Amino acid sequence: GESGSGKTTIRSHLLSAFLSFSSTPLSSKLSYAAFLFDTLTTTKSLTTQTASKAGLFLELQYDGSSSVNPTLIGGKIIDHRLERSRITSVPTGERSFHVLYYLLAGTSPAEKAHLGFDKAVHVSTSSGAIGHKRWRYLGHPTQLKVGVNDVEGFQHFKTALRKLEFPRSEIAEICQILATILHIGQLEFASGQATTTHAEESGGYSHEGGETVTIVKNKDVLSIIAAFLGLSVEDLENSFGYRTKTIHRERVTVMLDPKGARQNADELARTIYSLLVAYVIEAVNQRICAAEDSVANTISIVDFPGFAQACATGSTLDQLFNNAATELLYNFCLQSFFDRKADELEREEVSVPATSYFDNTDAVRGLLKHGNGLLSILDDQTRRGRTDNQLLESLRRRFENKNPTIIVEGSKRTSLISQNARSAFTVKHFAGEIDYSVNGLIEENGEFISGDLMRLMKSTKSDFVRELFGQAALQTVTHPKEKTAIMQAQVSSKPLRMPSMARRKTSPSSRLAFDAGDADEVESQAESIAKDSSSGRRKSAMLTSGIQGAAGQFLSSLDIVNKCLSSTNLNPYFIFCLKPNDRRIANQFDSKCVRAQVQMFGIAEISQRLRNADFSVFLPFAEFLGLAEIGNIVVVGSDKEKAEVVLDEKRWPGNEARVGSTGVFLSERCWADLAKVGERVVPVYAADMSDEGGDGLLHPRSTGYGDSKVRLLNPADQSPGAFIYGDEAKQGYFGSRDLDGRSDAGNSAFNSGDMFRNHETREQMLEKGNEKKMEEVDDAPISGSRKRWIALVYLLTFYIPDFAIKLFGRIKRKDVRMAWREKFAINLIIWFSCGVAIFFIVAFPGLVCPTQHVYSAAELSSHNGKDGHSSFIAIRGVVFDLDKFMPGHYPHIVPESALKKYAGVDATGLFPVQVSALCQGKSGSVDPTVLLDYRPTNISGSATTISGTDTNSVYHDFRHFTNDSRPDWFYEQMVMLKANYLKGYVGYTPKYLNTLGKKSQSIGSINGKVYDLTSYIAGGRLTKAPPGETVPSDVDTDFMDNSVVSLFQSLPGQDLSKHWENLKIDALRRRMQLCLDNLFFVGHVDTRNSAQCEFARYFILAISVLICSIIVFKFLAALQFGRKNVPENLDKFIICQVPAYTEDEESLRRAIDSMARMRYDDKRKLLVVICDGMIIGQGNDRPTPRIVLDILGVPESVDPEPLSFESLGEGQKQHNMGKVYSGLYEVQGHIVPFLVIVKVGKPSEVSRPGNRGKRDSQMVLMKIPERVHYNLPMSPMELEMHHQIRNVIGVNPTFYEFILQVDADTVVAPDSATRMVAAFLNDTRLIGVCGETALTNAKTSAVTMIQVYEYYISHNLTKAFESLFGSVTCLPGCFTMYRIRSAETAKPLFVSKEVVDAYAEIRVDTLHMKNLLHLGEDRYLTTLLLKHHSKYKTKYISSAKAWTIAPESWTVFLSQRRRWINSTVHNLIELIPMQQLCGFCCFSMRFVVFVDLLSTVIQPVTLAYIIYLIYWLVKDTSTIPYTSLILLAAIYGLQALIFIIRRKWEMVGWMIVYLLALPVFSLPCPSTLSGTWTTLPGVTHVSSQERKAGKVVISDEGKFDPASIPKKKWEEYQTELWEAQTSRDDRSEVSGISYGTKSYHPAQSEYGFPGSRPMSQLDLPRFGSRMSLAPSEMMSRHADMEMENLSHLPSDDAILAEIREILRTADLMSVTKKSIKLELERAFGVNLDLKRPYINSGKGYTFPFPVLRTVC
């Protein structure tokens, strides 16, 4: 029937009817099993709420103990092809599989919290779905409420699992996996920048952290998924961002964009659900299936999804499979009614009228025929790795004009555009024509699960997930050479079990059905997969593995079904389901709709056939007569005549009963009548179902079990559960007794409470998943410096206990806690350094010379309110702010101009004082009539004092004798003025006090305060009474003690503090002090020019000047004037290395072309490109190695075998494999030899195969010269590189003296190599040279703009200064040339054993080593060169230019600077202890290195100081810090002079941009450094107290055995080469490459693969190696020659000596083999044709480049 016609419903009724005959615990289990199948595989579609989306072959198994009343002994569910696409693509208006909705709706709040359903996700804003959560995999939120009782469904689901004996823990795991699938749909992906550096990062831009990666935005959802799958969050997130595929026979990792990551996540969801369904069904079958030998008969229900007119989920493959299965079943139906019956009738000589019918055999044959049917072709094309268009072409060739039911559109000559538009084929099904698109069909048919996912799941900590991915339903493809390496996998589209009848051959006692031949065929088809032998060249993984695609598996499963149905002893029954209307309206009959279905299924023709011949059963005469029981009737004649008598007696119609030649044909009705089926007593069995633990035995009962008969007819007992259809009151598989038969507490808690109560929490699972695998390794000694550092770390962090880090930081591992302590200690050191810097800048001067708020007379007079100056005024030694005071002066009638005339002067005379109010005198009181005539000292020598005769003084005179006496007025005013307007005090320097003392002034200082008693001693003590009163006669005007007065008289102008303390006036001291402070105080001692203050001032100044002097020195070093003469042509051999990672083609082409176009002798350049892994970067359409090879012109047909070499990595990752290509690259007239090394990794590597990082790429090239110079054994790939350089390119590797390292995003100037080599030749003590690097993307963004000036000045100032000492501390890896060996002694330098071993360190077990090796390998390489070759120099030359790409985004820029600062700090720490750094005085490099280190750490303080200076200048224009400004001007002015002198006028603008961005460089970078100082997630070797061995390694790569990589010396290699070639005459060592010719014999390697063919018209030397498989045209012919008398010819040794002499004096640019032969013939005077093979072989010598052509 069609979809929505009720097939699933009727199937459930049918099953219930069968099970009602044996109501046993087993029948209940079978009912539960069918319900589980429906729950997992049915969905709500547009036409029905129970649309089946998987084919079902449901088998009920019976024993043969009773031929009349067989016993039900088991059952089997065989599922066919679940519609997996529905999981991730829910059609509009439909639902996904019911179980997902059950889980969401039926879980309790506690369970929802555990499953992560309690968090709001994607809340829809549409009016129709307010409040619903939007789940991507559940369709529109309205589908959550469509009349299906999901809550009850979930309870039934759990009950069914428990009744089928699933453990509770397993049920919980199943629910977790289902929740995981829903959460995978919620993941949101975005593009981000990789800001965390790993050891595997490589290349230029990408190495700087600029690699675009895909990240998960909602990390909370990701953590839920990781917890339930038992995986690490980081590993899971990374796995979504890439996918490993097999492209052109190569494993390639594709870096995915967010869209690709979404597809990757969808694949994961489909895979998990498919495996879960397979797992549950197989587990159910294990519980219900009987032993195959005990099964005698079966009743099978076959139900496949209905015919699909449209592709609802977008999966053409699912639609094709569904319709193919429906086509097959319909064809079987027609065959059963027409063809098979006709054959039997004809054989029995029974004639019936013929009936015409629609025959769909052509469609079935076209779709399902083995070998050349459509599904077979699809599978074959998938296995061959063909494209969709190639599939279409194959279908066209197969079916065009050959099968009318399959039409392939278009033709061969169709244009590409129209071909893509028409890429579809049409199948004429019995139900109508359907167009199937081929776009993506090949890939969909593969249904491959990437090896990345399998590798990820291999690391799961969840036993259940491990079991899911370990079941037989998951077919894996392993590498042919490494069986443990899973390349890819596939969820089987074929059932795990076969029908019982397919397993059994025909037996006499059973009607279970195959004959021997069919049974053997089906058995072999089901249990074995043909293995394709892989001979010759390597094929795709699918072709070599023999794994079938989905089409092949589905076809074989349909074939088994068809053979089972077509078996001879099977009786088929057909049920046609017709839907009454297309609109799902109850009680409405649409005749048009029904008529269309009747016509489609040919029901009228079938009915007509049955009217003519309704013969379902054929009985031989003996069996028929036995059933007819004619023993009492005497009939004389043959059996046939007796049968005719019986038929006449029964009076059955002729279309239901006919006599044949050997038996009788009967209809079902006639057979039932004959066998008296209705009269038999069918015993009904029952068992105690109150407890699952019952005996399970069957007990005959006199009456039927409960409702065993009612279930067949009662509409209240619908199946499979009326809740699926939306009627909660109805019961289906479950009666009220079955929903939950047990009432114990545990069960009810499980059913309605929290099934995860005794389960691990999500947090525990997440922590378990994040744990690293640990295994023991050998103990490694800890260095003394490391021990001292650890001691310092604990000293700084001892107050933080380990348990606190473990508890609050959630850090369980001891090594990570130690790393955290180190980070925290480093933070403390950084901030302590900043604090020390702040202390010296701010606090230190204040401590040595406390700040004084004093003003000298000159300073006071300068504050006169004129020319923008402020207005200050002094009163009795106290300085006030007149500007602030004037607006509030009372009375307001006094104009401000009148007040301003007092600005800058001492106005003490304006304020007469009442002595008695301010001084208690000697006796405790002073007579109020006593006056003090105070005249302030004129300390400036100018008119800065106001006399007491000033007219305004009367306004402040409130003394006793006035008519307005206010004794305390002055004191109150001073208190108010000091509180609001105080600026400081009048200052007297000790020197000036001494001067005044010499001028007979009675002035002195006590404890820093200056007192002037001159007027008191000179007679200024007066008396005056108020008007009308007289002055008492006994007034004592001497209110000061004589000892005090005499002290000032005897020691004028001095510090009287000690003398004051020694006075014997203890009783009077307080009163005298009060009088001095109130009446005679004139200011403070000014110590600003004292020795301590001068020290404080000049100490900071000296440091500033010292640092600035370094700047000056750097400036002088940068002024390297002189003519930039272009050197003469140089004859040194150089290697130009370019590491490639994920760069785009444009960047790679620019870099490679710029190297090739350098104005340096092409024959002496070797371009080496090292591709770090088989990776397709985002935005690229090919792997990076393929891009490089395409640029260099290497065709895809050149495919060398990968060879082993030792790499930098953890564990087994140290074993890497690589391919070697060589040839000539021609660009713009330059022809340059090249070598390409492609790191492809071992077969077991499925993720980023071969990728080991930039440092490893450098090591690949560094090890070759090292092995050569030290004559060390080489790995196979190194031997091949040596062979390619020496024998193919034609240059002895020892000739190369320099290596130029350039990043893949860097473009070099044409003369850069020439200038660098010239520098090396001018100074033989030079080991490394770098040039000036500028930016190509300077104006791309604001981030790049702020870097332009910094790049320029860092080269032309810092590096130029370091170059003066020959100690450039950082030779950038993007543009540096190194000296490979010493010019005089050939001693290895760059490739010396010490440097190579130190640089190849793989134990990165500390933060320090991680910062050295992973964050700044270029700088560390320079550090190693300076450490191990201290007598050699590193240099910077500005004449060599290159241009690179700077980070364009803020995130990448900060990431880059964080790594740079980390690397700088740690490398400077390495350099500081070195004694060998050159220099002189305080300008030694050690000092400069220390200053650089310190300046890097305290950059935030520097920025803060500059901001403070600016604030100071803005706030107080009167006080200008000239020194600071001069120093700053010197720093930046000298920098400006550099580019001004060099006429780099554009740098003026870039300098302004840089200065504006100074906060960016000074604050965020160091603060980011300290806040997120490099973490240690990749710690590999750490101490652990938990392991007695002392060390553990955290690695899942296994241990590396160096013996797994065979090594041999070059001499051994050559010896074996010679022996191999002399022992066999069919192989010549002269099997070279003739490039540019049509006949070409590749140079072979020892390892048996053809060499590469560069694209050039030149011929490379024909050197082969031992195991060359392709014969050369120069095959040795010694064995075929006639043995002549060769005594007159010179010996080989003589020829060799003469050749060497010729080469020593010949022009190597023009010499050829032919010219050498002619020279030899002249020298020896004989014809040397017989010696030609020896001359051409090159034994004992090597022809130099250019290659000598074999033309003799």
UniProtKB/Swiss-Prot annotation:
This is Chitin synthase E. CDD domains: MYSc_Myo17 (cd14879). One of its GO terms (biological process) is chitin biosynthetic process. It catalyses: [(1->4)-N-acetyl-beta-D-glucosaminyl](n) + UDP-N-acetyl-alpha-D-glucosamine = [(1->4)-N-acetyl-beta-D-glucosaminyl](n+1) + UDP + H(+). It comes from Aspergillus fumigatus. The keyword Transmembrane helix applies. InterPro entries: Chitin_synth, Cyt_B5-like_heme/steroid-bd, Cyt_B5-like_heme/steroid_sf, DEK_C, Kinesin_motor_dom_sf, Myosin_head_motor_dom-like, MYSc_Myo17, Nucleotide-diphossugar_trans. Polymerizes chitin, a structural polymer of the cell wall and septum, by transferring the sugar moiety of UDP-GlcNAc to the non-reducing end of the growing chitin polymer. Important for hyphal growth and conidiophore development but not pathogenicity. Residues 1689-1744 form the DEK-C domain. In the N-terminal section; belongs to the TRAFAC class myosin-kinesin ATPase superfamily. Myosin family. Residues 852-940 form the Cytochrome b5 heme-binding domain.
